[in-house]
């Protein structure tokens, strides 16, 4: 019996070793070739750009946009990684990659509140030389300000968001009621119409919004507080108004008049998709969401209220003004990308007027570029953009600080507990949350 398992009959051990070494070299060359193919997309030699994005409401639109780009830029291949819909969960995914200086992220989307954090951490590439002031002026000023940190700009606006108010115009017409201007009018109108409709329609609620513990809750609650003359936090001055009477009373109103009253108790678990689904299924009279919800509300394949929906500014409290939280998404480049030139080529395309028009027409996303609000095709499909333009221009930002994730964590915990626990002392809880936020903001000032 052969003692050496690789012995070849009729040959000596020297020849056997030669065969083994040759075989191993061939295998190694094959592996090297395959690895090279992964890096350069096979023999085509394409530059691969890893694009990390959050889960959009209409994913097919982004696929179409990427396909157009790759057709017009055959030397570049886009590999898209789609994160979760929740901005909080997507933030966790993206920041973990950037902390690790991951090579599988070149271009990424940022929520409007992230640029200061990403800039301070050194994750986002400064774009001043690539995106100079003459180009910046083509975008809404609020979006440029949101992407600026210490005189450098770190993102290019993709689309703008602000909270808006949707209503069933057919039901308001039926009962000869106006669009509510105040939150109390909304609650009163909802109670009356739901009561009357219950005689024939037992599945109608008065209101639907986003009240789960996540970033969307902060957006919603800021709108109530601001529209009562209150404030959430001032990053520049390092103060929080959560403990002041206007803020406390606004939160109390939500707890006592919205949760489980005008809205079902289940809204405490709702993000945007769940709250919108209640509305488009014809089960909510009023609804707070972002501009994209208009397109879905009027899509016959997704909505039972097509042609029955109106849109307006959010209500406010008596004697105060309407406020809308600034939202929207930006496109940034990883400071660790090895293909920054190709990445910028993709960012330019993605934020162009041409692509923002596609996003407006096919996904209902409000453009960040000012000139598109005069586009006849967009206004024909979304006439309310003309009226809502002022809302987009004056939308109110959340506290602009690199430590915003810590601030948001305090806000989310406080708001969630405050609106879901009827027996807690709101004044005490609010004061405690305000003190926590001021300590966080003091840390930022101490680090400057």
Model feature map: region roles:
Residues 38, 142-146, 307-313, 360-413, ...:
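Long, aromatic- and glycine/proline-rich binding clefts that accommodate carbohydrate-like moieties
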Residues 45-56, 76-81, 106-107, 205, ...:
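Short, well-ordered beta-strand elements
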Residues 57-77, 411, 430:
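Short, polar/charged alpha-helical segment
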Residues 68, 72-139, 146, 170-181, ...:
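Extracytoplasmic "Venus flytrap"/periplasmic binding protein-like
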Residues 166-169, 326-339, 418:
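A bilobed periplasmic-binding-protein/Venus flytrap-type ligand-binding module shared by bacterial periplasmic
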